[in-house]
């Protein structure tokens, strides 16, 4: 059987995967954002995950049976595919409840073109049971086909690390699964054909779903632990980073650093597992405690900065502060669920005027998402305080002394500045 793949959703997860598959198979990348499609077909990836030459190296001008990637927002272009890989976001709502709307919508799209023998693979991070209990019924309803008789499903959780040019998609081992043992093997072989790091075939879709959601929950809890340590050691006037460095000399000490936990994965996925646990009558203690602690860190950083400013005799109301970075992580333009926003809002509550400088973030995106003004140009003014919130590579070469007033405060959230900061986590 000739394999033809449709990748639904061309964001940070879908595009690198579609590009990789396109080196071996005919691939149609589908996204409802027409501007995104136009950019990609011109060889421009706004997420900066794929460079122009690499992207143009796989692009083709039409949906055919030739190897390569064709990007489209027209549903007819995916109707001849036999593998559908769904890579849409799985966010939470304002009450931190899972929002499966993107999954439902993409399942409806696939259902409209689903044929006998097709396989639908989900990569979006979900709680155990979503694929078979939430997505499959949508596929059956829209297509009129019967699951595991007419069409089949798989689940292979994404492990993309945005901004990481070392651990790219083909270099990260892939967990795979299928709705039957035979389909599991077929899904596994498909990924194995392009993932050089290898694959791990899980015994069921639910096992694969659970594996992914605990990867991120474990990381969230570990960061919450060191964030709590940072609060304690700050009260004891001990350098947290020095403590972690000393403790890290033991071979089995886990290397985590304190910080703001944002983005579309670590700060979101634990809520998916918590929701499923609560549905079954169990209240997760550690998972939600970790979330509460990590969500409190933005306000904590702001309060620490203000205390340092007061100690230096700086008038808080009307003070000028430079925030370095707004994205959720370094060397990446992604501003989804960034916790720098919590710091900015908390500082503004004190009456501090915050200027946000980030060479990676799109000002229009930040304005749309958070109603905040950012600049890609380094300001020429001097400030009462500077907060390094994101460890972009550009920030390590800036002479911050020229931007800071003589008695100004420098706070290093990430612990990366060579010069002596007045405070850090």
Stretches found by the model and what they are:
Residues 1-425:
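Structural/interface elements that position substrates and couple domains in central-metabolism enzymes
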């Amino acid at each position: 059987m000739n394999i033809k793949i449709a990748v639904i959703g061309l964001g940070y997860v879908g595009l690198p995967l579609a590009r990789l598959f396109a080196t071996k198979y005919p691939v149609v990348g589908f996204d409802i954002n027409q501007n995104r499609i136009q950019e990609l077909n011109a060889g421009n990836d706004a997420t900066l995950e794929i460079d122009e030459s690499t992207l143009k190296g796989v692009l083709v001008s039409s949906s055919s049976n030739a190897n390569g990637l064709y990007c489209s927002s027209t549903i007819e272009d995916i109707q001849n595919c036999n593998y559908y890989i769904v890579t849409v976001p799985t966010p939470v709502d304002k009450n931190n409840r899972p929002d499966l709307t993107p999954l439902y919508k993409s399942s409806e799209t696939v259902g409209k073109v689903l044929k006998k023998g097709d396989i639908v693979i989900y990569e979006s991070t979900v709680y155990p049971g979503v694929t078979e209990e939430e997505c499959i019924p949508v596929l059956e309803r829209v297509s009129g086909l019967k699951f595991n008789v007419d069409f089949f499903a798989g689940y292979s959780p994404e492990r993309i690390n945005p901004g990481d040019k070392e651990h790219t998609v083909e270099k990260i081992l892939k967990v795979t699964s299928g709705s039957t043992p035979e389909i599991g093997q077929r899904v596994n072989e498909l990924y194995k054909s392009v993932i050089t790091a290898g694959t791990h075939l899980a015994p069921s879709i639910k096992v694969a779903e659970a594996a992914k959601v605990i990867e991120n929950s474990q990381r969230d809890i570990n960061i919450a632990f060191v964030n709590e340590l940072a609060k304690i050691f700050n009260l004891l006037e001990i350098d947290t980073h020095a403590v972690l460095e000393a403790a890290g000399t033991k071979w089995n000490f886990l290397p985590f650093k304190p910080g703001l936990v944002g983005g579309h994965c670590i700060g979101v996925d634990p809520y998916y597992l918590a929701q499923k646990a609560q549905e079954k009558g169990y209240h997760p203690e550690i998972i939600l405690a970790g979330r509460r602690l990590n969500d409190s860190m933005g306000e904590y950083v702001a309060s620490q900065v203000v205390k340092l400013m007061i100690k230096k005799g700086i008038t808080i109301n009307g003070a000028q502060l430079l925030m370095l970075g707004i994205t959720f992580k370094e060397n990446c333009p992604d501003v989804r669920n960034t916790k720098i926003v919590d710091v900015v809002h908390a500082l503004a509550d004190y009456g501090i005027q915050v200027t946000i400088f980030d060479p990676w973030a799109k000002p229009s995106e930040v304005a749309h998402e958070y109603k905040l003004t950012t600049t890609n140009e380094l300001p020429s003014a001097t400030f009462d305080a500077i907060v390094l919130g994101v460890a972009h590579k550009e920030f390590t070469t800036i002479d911050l002394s020229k931007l800071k007033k003589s008695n100004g405060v420098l706070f290093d959230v990430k612990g990366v500045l060579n010069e002596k900061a007045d405070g850090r986590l």
